[in-house]
Amino acid sequence: MAHDSKAAYNRFLLLVAGLGGLLYGVDVGIIAGALPYLEATSGLNAGQLSIVVAAVLLGSVISTLFAGTLADWMGRRLLMTISGLLFVISIPVIALSHGYQPLVLGRLLQGISAGLIGVVVPLYLAECLSASSRGKGTGIFQWLLTLGIVAAAVVGMYFSIRVEQVAKIGDAARLFAFKDTAWRSIFWVSLPPGALFVIGSVMVAESPRWLFRRGKRDAALAAL
């Protein structure tokens, strides 16, 4: 029974880590589907749109520099939770925005989230899984990262088809309104996996290696 329980927990851990990879992929790919409609309805110039696109990369570069230090300071699980919360917060900041600054802020938050996830989730997997399972964990993380990019593209494709259908009606005002709704909806769709990642991160145990390093031997043994 103990073996079955441990196996079930490891599957749950892999699921949570996989959701982290999915969010990373969504961070990278989501703007591609939203950009044409954002450009058509936001009134932003080319330079501003370029910054909105690049802000996620800037946020990722910055957070990656400090992710390891933060993971050592506050723990792997807490940093995973915070990274998920940053992603969740970024969605309404972007989707409800009506100006340049909120868009950039939301994209920066997404980038910071992605940078943290890209460091702390593989680190957490390496410290929590057995040597025989680490390759599987890394593979699942990378596979779902790629799936996140593909999923973002599929969502963008769906809305492009819907926009084409509305365009055939010939009502310019309706088309403009739908394009505005489309890019916001593309971001809203990515909210549920972010929320699931946060919930999962709260439910998993802290890394036993981190607990040992903090002198919390009993807690570390319980987490094994």
Where are these regions (language model features)?
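Transmembrane-helix signature of 12-pass secondary carriers
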Residues: 1-224
